[in-house]
Amino acid sequence: MSITKKPNDTMKAVEIVKFGGPENLKLKLRNIPKLKKGEILIKVHYAGVNRPDILQREGNYPVPKTASDIPGLEVSGIVVDREKSATKYPVGSKICALCHGGGYAEYVAVNQNHCLPIPKKLSLEEAACIPETFITVWSNVFLRGGLKKNESILIHGGASGIGTTACLLYTSPSPRDDR
């Protein structure tokens, strides 16, 4: 399929057929989401797996009423359509996005303000973890927390997605001079 060709009406999506382990995730046919004001339609190439997705699958995280029942909070992919007021990313753009659920599907509709262009040095696969994990750590540790060069940080749960990202960002050379 050409990246500029609009998809058919249906898509494959992962549904939680009953609460429990991963064996309760099944591939089903669903309608492609209709675009609302300011939204873009992304052909999903990769989706991150995050703790809320697991909790949702286990029945320990009720889906907000305005969110999709399809798991998946962060994705990377290519813009295939956009609502007329969504002008930030042209069709064909490679982006990553923070979703209000729905990432475990072939297509997801996301507000354009929840999307980021993918840095040229990153693959679609690598970029899928930017919206939820990387941005969460960066905004909380460096922007809000103000962590500076030669300061220490205690990272609880260093083996989680957020914890691993925090460890990597803390020990990496910073693009910012003040870290």
Task: Spell out what each predicted region is.
Residues 21-25, 51-52:
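Short N-terminal binding/cap micro-motifs at the start of the first secondary-structure element
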Residues 173-179:
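Single conserved hydrophobic/aromatic residue that forms the stacking wall/gate
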